[in-house]
């Protein structure tokens, strides 16, 4: 099931052959958001994390434009948990995240829940623009960073 936001952008399931390029996007997006952290060192963790989530029912997807992977989505339709939306740095602000979120909403029509770092103002604005509300504070179990719990309901 593919969702399109623009004629030249397709969201489709992540294939094993896509993983390295999808992880390149993951590293670059997080590196842009948090330049003081070396996300390349977290690449193997990200690959294992995505595989674990997929084994538990998550559906990783990629946004593809002109045969290049420009975004990554990891969402679990069974729980409505949105684990990741990341967009290649060069493609940010071009509707890729909108397409990925629309795909997540299509897969989870009853609603989505997520955690977002409290200091990630750009992501918080993006989610609020799309109808998400902050439902409470939490702490990232891996990093100890304060996060917001956010939810979207149709």
Label the model's feature ranges.
Residues 1-17, 152:
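Conserved N-terminal entry element of GNAT/NAT acetyltransferase domains
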Residues 13-90, 101-103, 107, 140:
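Acetyl-CoA-dependent GNAT
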Residues 58, 145-150:
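Short hydrophobic/aromatic beta-strand or adjacent loop that forms the aromatic wall/cage
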Residues 88-94, 118-119:
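Active-site acidic-Proline motif in GNAT/NAT acetyltransferases
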Residues 93-106, 125, 129:
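Conserved acetyl-CoA-binding loop-helix of GNAT-fold acetyltransferases
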Residues 97, 101, 119-123, 140-146:
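Short glycine/proline-centered loop/turn elements that form peptide/ligand docking sites
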Residues 107-119:
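Conserved GNAT acetyl-CoA-binding A-motif
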Residues 128-137:
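Conserved acetyl-CoA-binding loop of GNAT-fold acetyltransferases
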